[in-house]
């Protein structure tokens, strides 16, 4: 199963995760992070996230895809959409 997340890099180089309304500090607890089941769902939140990221003077915003790799029981992470701000 693949999941999609929206992240930013702040002007200070910190990575923050989208919770559906705001960007929150990156940490290992992903319970508060908004997870999308499809790229289309993530893109539907893109404009709102970009607007907030710009107001925060973020360096960039991206949609990342986390893919479960059953053969090694791990996740592969790749950036599938990136915009420099």
Where are these regions (language model features)?
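Short aromatic-glycine-(Arg/Gly/Cys) micro-motifs in beta-strand/loop hairpins
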Residues: 1-32
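Short, mixed-charge low-complexity intrinsically disordered segments
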Residues: 39-85
